Amino acid sequence: LESDFADMDVIGISGNFCSDKKPAAVNWIEGRGKSVVCEAIIKEEVVKKVLKTDVALLVELNMLKNLAGSAVAGALGGFNAHAGNIVSAIFIATGQDPAQNVESSHCITMMEAVNDGKDLHISVTLPSIEVGTVGGGTQLASQSACLNLLGVMGACKESPGSYSRLLATIVAGSVLAGELSLMSAIAAGQLVKSHMKYNRSSKDVSKAAS
C-alpha cells in the first residue's frame, strides 16, 4: 500500500470495514466468506405426520416470529429461529473459528405455501459463512476426523476451494433442518413440553445411576 500511496500513513492494518467477528450490514450487501442459499419443499404429508403441524401455521409463525419479531427487536442478521446454534456446533466440531459464528450465523429464514397451499417451501439465506478445511483447528485430531467424515478434509488438489464451498453448503443445509425442526416444535406446542420432560436439571446428575 505504501508503495502505491506514498503519502499515506499506515495507522493500522485493519480499519474494521472487514467487520470480522462483528454483525454488520456490509455482510448482507457484499457477502463475506461463502454466501449460500439452501431451500427445500416439504410435502404436506410430512408436515402433518412427522412435524406434527400444518403448512399455514408454519408460514404464519415464521412471518410473525422470524421476520416481524426480529424487525421489532432491531435485528441486523438474525431473521431466523436459531441458526447460531447450528453454526456454532458445526464450527466447533470441524475446527473453525468459533468467534466467526457472529457473522456466519447471519441468516434469514423464509417459508411459504406452494402447490395450492398444500406443501411448504422453506429457504435459508446465509450471506457470510466463513469456513476452511486447512490450517488452524482443522488439524486437530477430533476436528479433522469430523471433516473426513463429511468428505471435506484438507485441500482439494483437483478443484482448489471446493471443499470449503461444500462445507459451507453443509452448514446451510444443517441450518435449514434446524430451522424446520424448531419452528415445527413451536408451532405444535411441543417445545416447552419437551424441555420440561427431558430437563436434566430436575434430576440429581451428580449421583451415578444404580
From Swiss-Prot:
- What's the Enzyme Commission number for this chain? 1.1.1.34
Which superkingdom? Eukaryota
Instruction: Please give, as recorded in its UniProt entry, the membrane topology of this protein.
Output: Multi-pass membrane protein
Q: Which terms are listed as keywords in the entry?
A: Endoplasmic reticulum, Glycoprotein, Isoprene biosynthesis, Membrane, Mitochondrion, NADP, Oxidoreductase, Plastid, Transmembrane, Transmembrane helix
One Pfam match, by short name?
Answer: HMG-CoA_red
Active site positions, chain numbering = 21, 97, 195
Q: Which residues are glycosylated?
A: 199
Q: What is this protein called?
A: 3-hydroxy-3-methylglutaryl-coenzyme A reductase 2
The encoding gene is: HMGR2
